[in-house]
Amino acid sequence: MTIAGSDTLAGGGLQSDLKTFEDYHLFGLTAITCIAVVKNGQFAITNLPTELLNDQLNTIKDNLSLDGIKLGLIHQLESLEIVKSFLRSFDGPIVLDPVMAFKETDHVYNDSYREKLIELFPFATVITPNLKEAELLSQQKISNPTEMEQAAKKIIDLGAQSVVIKGGQRLSGNLASDLFYNSETFQYFSKPKLSNVTINGAGCTFASAIAANLVLGKDLVNAIEDSKEYVYQGIKNGLLLKNGEGNVWFGDSVKSEVMT
């Protein structure tokens, strides 16, 4: 299942999670935390009442068995506490995408949110911050692989079992490299950088693909490797929007290239 926000443009959020689960032939469930829209040209988030989030989680817990959980945007401190309580009764794979910064806006979350989010780390099999989020969590700048490794160590020290820092386009060079660290081993996953603007939802899709792969029995390293390729194909085959941006999308291409 995914516990995440709803993206009205369906590039990221629970919409991309469900599409990813479907590509991996898994039945996806949702608990919605908030709704993201574009209002007067500005990115805006409306929270759902925390009681409603709790009701959604209880509905799932009382009626279904879960094989894996992906955590996305959990916008309120009270919601983080509700989710933490829910995770205590689950012992399967959990992938946490620690959403703290957005491409669409300069908004970032405050220290109180950071501290509450960190309380979820021990429950997660792996967390998947982008560079900005890794900087916020580790409280250091990241401008090269050495600093990325330093940040990964600090994130593990916060209680994470393992972390994948998504390098994206920001670091120099021709490769988009993600760094995996589990307190023992560093491993890079790299693909050639793409110039495509169809990147909305890449982070959400990456995390939900890892969750899907773990549910299907892959070990964590192979799950990350497969998910990296899956997202790469989604960016290559993405859907352009009227505003000049675009969503990750796969069509029929990804199933033949990745799902074999």
Predicted regions and their residues:
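N-terminal beta1-alpha1 ligand-phosphate binding loop
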Residues: M1-Q15, S208
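Conserved N-terminal subdomain of the carbohydrate kinase-like
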Residues: M1-T2, S16-K103, S253-E257
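Short pre-catalytic strand/loop immediately N-terminal to key active-site residues, enriched for Gly-Thr
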Residues: A4-L9, F186-N200
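Short, small-residue alpha-helix embedded
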Residues: Q15, L136, N196-L220
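Phosphate-handling active-site elements
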Residues: H25-L29, Q187, N213-S227
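Charged C-terminal helix
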Residues: N47, N222-T260
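Conserved phosphate/ATP/ADP-binding segment of small-molecule kinases
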Residues: N110-T185
